[in-house]
Amino acid sequence: CPPCTQCRVAPASGSNPSVAEMSTLFDRIAAGPQAYGTLGWNFGGRTTVGAGPGWCGTTGRRDTVPVTFPCVLLKAIYLTESAWRQFCTTNQTVISFDCGYGIAQVTSGMRRGETSSYDAARVASSAAYNVSVGAAILADKWRASPCVGLNDPEIIEDWYFSVWGYNGFSFRNNPNNPMFRADRPEFRTPGVASAQVRSNYPYQELVWGYSRYPLTSAHYRGIALVYP
């Protein structure tokens, strides 16, 4: 995983936590910055999100709640992004061609000449901090995305458009894009039989597939999700 020469921060040296350690880490980050404290980034103070259909132009509750995430959602997103790797086999930070760093493949503010409100060096060096920044970006997508269902952040399926937005809210990830077969089967991860080619699916369907079919049973217990 060679770093892009246009990236802001040099790769850090380190080793990946074990699968069990990563699973525990995701559980802690999913509880939100008010729970995990100095383990990660504080989301720049943006520690609440809107919940309820009242935010969607309809009647119903319109609450503001602390940011939390369904645990399996974070685990599935970051299997999709990096297979839970902060560091390459060379013990250097995973950095993609477009300056995506680490487990969460954080790109915002990570290109040369850009700035960020979070510590870019810690994004490169710390698995916990990296994941917390990725979670903050996902929370921002929730705030900016169309509502699904009851607009309840405790329901994984209600994050559908937020997950789409995490990879870019573009036509490339539109499930009706003609580049994808209309009769495509659900995505199955490389860790199970009948795995499919990732490029044949929009991003959010990869995450839904990883949610049901983790790489191994040690990662988490798979959950089948429905589509909006």
Regions found by a protein language model. Name each.
Residues 1-36, 107-228:
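Non-catalytic cell-wall polysaccharide-engagement segments
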Residues 73-79, 85, 102-107, 138, ...:
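Structural recognition of the beta-strand scaffold that forms the well-ordered cores
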Residues 89-113:
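Short, surface-exposed glycine/acidic/tryptophan-bearing loops
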